[in-house]
Each structure stands twice: as C-alpha cells, then as structure tokens.
UniProtKB/Swiss-Prot annotation:
UniProt: Mg(2+) binding residues: E103
Gene from which this protein is expressed: pfkA
Family per similarity comment: Belongs to the phosphofructokinase type A (PFKA) family. ATP-dependent PFK group I subfamily. Prokaryotic clade 'B1' sub-subfamily.
Protein name per its UniProtKB record: ATP-dependent 6-phosphofructokinase
Subunit note: Homotetramer.
InterPro entries: ATP_PFK, ATP_PFK_prok-type, PFKA_ATP_prok, Phosphofructokinase_CS, Phosphofructokinase_dom, PKF_sf
Alphabetical list of SUPFAM superfamilies matching this protein: Phosphofructokinase
Positions annotated to bind ADP: R21, A22, V23, V24, R25, K155, G186, A187, E188, R212, K214, I215, N216
Top-rank lineage group of the source organism: Bacteria
Residue numbers binding ATP: G11, R72, C73, G102, E103, G104, S105
UniProt subcellular location: Cytoplasm
Residues annotated to bind substrate: T126, I127, D128, R163, M170, G171, R172, E223, R244, H250, V251, Q252, R253
C-alpha cells in the first residue's frame, strides 16, 4: 500500500482534526502518500482531493471543527453516487480510505467496501456517543465539558432569580449527553429518549424540592426526547410558575478538544493506519476498556447502544 486518503463526514466533532493529523503524520512516517478529501463524501464524488504533507497538519490538534470540512451528502446515499466515488478513488490510485464520522458516515464506508471493495477503516466521531461496541467516540468529552460549563453558569442565574431552567442538549436518539451532563451538574431532572417521562411526577419532584428550600431547578432534556418548549408547557401548567428555556444547539459541537479527546483521536488515527497496513479492512476502531480494538463496521452499527439505567437512577438520587 502506497497511497491512502482520509475524510471527515457528517456532523463535526471536536477532535476530528487530531485524528486527521495522526493519519497524515503516521502515514507519511510509514512511507505513504496521504490524500485529504474535502467536504466528506461530496468531495469524494467530486474528486476534491488535496495531498497532505507532514507540515500541512501542524498545529491542528487543538482546533475544533475539521480542516477538511464536512457535509451531509444525499447523492452518496444512492448506488450511483457511491459508484462515482469509487471511480474517483480508483482514478487517483488510492488504495485505502479512513473515514472519520458517525453512524451515517460509517455506513457509507461499509457500503464502499461491500459494493466496490474499497479498503476502508472507520473512526467513530460523534458527540452523541451512540455507536455500538465502543465505550467512547471522538468529541464526546469536549461536548460534555461545554454543556457542564453552560449549565453551571445557568445555575448561577437560576439561583439569583429562584427559577427553573430547562436546558435542551443534543441527542436525537441517545440520551448519553443529557444523562452525563445531568449527573455531573446535579440536575433535578433528566429527560432522555430511552425512558418515558411522567410530567406529573416531575412537577411533584420540583415542588417538593421547593418546599425543602431549594431555590433553583435545572431540567436537562435531550432533543430527541422532547423539545424544551414542550417540557416547559407541561411543567408550568403543573407547578404554577414560569420557567426559562436554554437551547445550547451547535455550540456543543465547537471548541478546542479536551486532552481526553485529543488523546483518543490521535490514538485512533494511528490504529486506523495500522489496520490498513495490516490489510484488516471494513473495520471500525473502537475503545473497549482502555484498549483500542478493531471491530467489523456493521457489527458496531447493528449493536444498539443504550444509556446506563443504573447511572440514571443514581443521578436521580444524587440530585
């Protein structure tokens, strides 16, 4: 193997740049030519390629986002689109592809291998942390720290005004961010897609906390469970006073990655190149315990990842 490519796809996650840097520098150290694909699968179809040298990735580890840029490509979801991408790969003599992204991106990588035998290795990067068979995805730790910092600031003003704040965080199908953020900030309630919410019980809990002298309430809701406005309507009707809503939105995706995310991304980037050199393809690099392992992409994607129900109960007891 002499020439490989790397792309970032789907929603950006802090640490993607660190993974790109590792792929490029480790690849170059092993005598490989490394090609960067701009704009994810859209760039793969269009042939938007750039050769990346050692110096091109200097100083990017600490940067959020992705220097390669990213996109969500509808064309790549078609067989015709993937055929165009495969033709570009073969035309440019690329012998292996590292795909950094979430569920959709990894599915695309698998299809490239299944349909066109393009050697691919996936690196899980998504702040939702909803990919199976890996304990952690790139970007999760940074996102959690961003949410934690925001909630702590909201608690200051919530206490000053004796108010209840409803904080909506990302997580369409997974409540991981909401659960962990709620646990570490001592939120009074955590609403996640995996567990049905009883608004009457929630209101009773908030009112009971008020009777015990607590002057603020923080409710963290994952976007996939309910909108913050829906939660507010249900609660205000039952508790009899106004709430305040904060939707953190895309601020959760940005920012300089934490030390934990940088280390994970750099390690996964190195392991991805090793997997290609070893001829072990159609695999995803996963963190299990404290060890990086290679698992089949579709096995990871077909393994449903759920939140820790015991941790959810602990968060409730400690709030």
């Amino acid at each position: 193997m002499k020439k490989i490519a790397v792309l970032t796809s789907g929603g950006d996650a802090p640490g993607m740049n660190a993974a790109v840097r590792a792929v490029v520098r480790y690849g170059v150290r092993h005598g490989l030519e490394v090609i960067g694909v701009r704009r994810g699968y859209s760039g793969l179809i269009d042939g938007d390629f750039v050769k990346l040298e050692y110096k091109d990735v200097a100083g990017i580890t600490e940067k959020g986002g992705t220097i390669l840029r990213t996109s969500r490509c509808e064309e790549f979801k078609t067989e015709e689109g993937r055929e165009l991408a495969a033709k570009q790969i073969k035309k440019h003599g690329i012998e292996g592809l590292v795909v950094i992204g979430g569920e959709g991106s990894l599915t695309g990588a698998h299809l490239l291998y299944e349909e066109h035998k393009i050697p691919v290795v996936g690196i899980p990067a998504t702040i939702d942390n909803d990919i199976g068979l890996t304990d952690m995805c790139i970007g999760v730790d940074t996102c959690l720290n961003t949410v934690m910092d925001a909630v702590q600031k909201l608690k200051d003003t919530a206490s000053s005004h004796e108010r209840a704040f409803i904080v909506e965080v990302m997580g369409r199908h997974s409540g991981y961010i909401a659960l962990m953020a709620g646990l570490v900030t001592g939120a009074e309630a955590i609403i996640v897609p995996e567990i049905p919410v009883d608004y009457s019980q929630l209101a009773d809990r908030i009112l009971e906390e008020r009777r015990r002298g607590k002057i603020n309430s923080i409710i963290i809701v994952a976007e996939g469970a309910a909108s913050a406005y829906t939660v507010a309507r249900h609660l205000e009707y039952r508790i009899g006073y106004e709430t305040r809503i904060t939707i953190l939105g895309h601020v959760q995706r940005g920012g300089s990655p934490t030390a934990s995310d940088r280390r994970l991304a750099l390690s996964m980037g190195v392991e991805a190149v090793d997997a290609l050199l070893d001829g072990e393809v159609d695999v995803m690099i996963a963190l299990q315990g404290n060890k990086l392992v290679r698992v089949p992409i579709m096995e990871a994607l077909s393994t449903k990842k759920t939140i820790d129900k015991k941790l959810y109960e602990i968060a409730y007891m400690l709030s």
